[in-house]
From Swiss-Prot:
Protein's name according to its UniProt entry: Protein dml1
Entry similarity comment: Belongs to the misato family.
Coiled coil: none
A biological-process GO annotation: mitochondrion organization
Species this chain originates from: Aspergillus clavatus (strain ATCC 1007 / CBS 513.65 / DSM 816 / NCTC 3887 / NRRL 1 / QM 1276 / 107)
Amino acid sequence: MHEIITLQLGQRANYLATHFWNLQESYFTYNEGEESPIDHDVHFRAGVGADGSETYTPRTLIYDLKGAFGTLRKQNALYELSTDSEYGQGLWDGKEVIQKQTPIIPSEYQLNLEQGLPAPALSSETVRYWSDYNRVFYHPRSIIQLNDYELNSKIMPFEDWDVGEDLFNDLDKEHDLLDRDVRPFAEECDQLRAFQLFAGSDDAWGGFAAKYLDRIRDEYGKKAVWVWAMEGGSKLQRRNQLKRDINKARSIHAMAPQSSLYVPIKDPPGHVPSTINLDAQSEWQTSALISSALETVTLPTRLRPYHDFETSLAGEDGMHKIFELQSTILPEDKTPTGAAGGNEASTEATSKVKTEFDMDFTYDDPQNRNSHIFNQVQITRGYSPVTDEASIREDLGLSRKKRFYNSEPMLESFYTPLAFPTLDSFPHNLFPVKESNAKINILASLTASSRTAGKLRAMEVVARRVVGVDERENLVNGLGEIRESYETGWMSDSDFDDD
């Protein structure tokens, strides 16, 4: 097995990760002899419930602030035996004063799931927390509430990058978070493959995630680390926007060099086609849309047979770690050419680097015509492909070397007939499908291109103007060093002037 441990850091990250886990749960098969194309052991772990029954829960750690978990409890139906609600007083014979918070009323969706009834349609109004549309049981060790800060607090907002750093340092000093939280899951793994981090990057969660990543690298230096860096896509007042921009700059400076993959994700995305019916004010809806692309591009990491996804990301030089997330919803009646059959990987000559997508979740412009692409990983799902037998027989390593020596972009394509399921936990009219619970075909991509250089240069300008003198030189120089690997030999000074 090649297991992955997931860390979910913050409210925005948990909205997205909840969709991710719901999708993984939907791939389970329950008929004898029916095998899922997904290897569930990659993300799920076997255990024993409170009543001795076998359990299968996500290998994940969910961090969020006080008040952010909604009705999700640390103990659930798998791990909680019924107990008498009347607690004894022990040796205390004095008067008791019991204080209780007003309980959060479970959503109708959750109540119906618990009772085995058909799930009602969700809406932006009925989803109050990410747990309102959660369909998965978690191990009690997965639920970690940080009580030092409260969700949406005006008195102590969890916004500054330094605040997240300080909180991690304090908690790690007191508890040793890796030893308490990560190690129990890691020691269960036969062959730990990677860590996957869903994390906010433009608020205090960026600082928290950066320090966590430092500790992971110290302890598990050779393991891959994939960072999905969530950032707000809506415009703010100038002062708040500058704070957000500096937080993003500090996050990418601290985490990108230590990551195997670092993907900035705008929530909501800057451009959405008219065929997508999106309420951009609803995190439930925007994260559902993002999950359709993210869950698709990560499919090769859990498909049978095993795929060396890390090699695909590294390209030929291993220099480029910042990727763009893009996707296109494909029409049902269109069949791609040059795609490999089965759950296959290919770099055949008929595969083309794609520069135009319906949705770009990293940058505002979905068009990529004028930039140089260094590496691209494409994942197509849901089609019956036209198979080019000669190209499949060609050695993939040889194909990559040909592209490298011809100064062509590194390109690897994956195909799976497993279409994307639109679950009842999704907005029912988000995608252009004729009926609810339909499946859709998606082309998603991770692309490393010279566009990243322009974004990093813009961060340098802001950092040089806003950041204090003690940190300014280190941050600006660090961003510059990262930028150089995305522009050398491909971008001129005039290109930057155009930006």
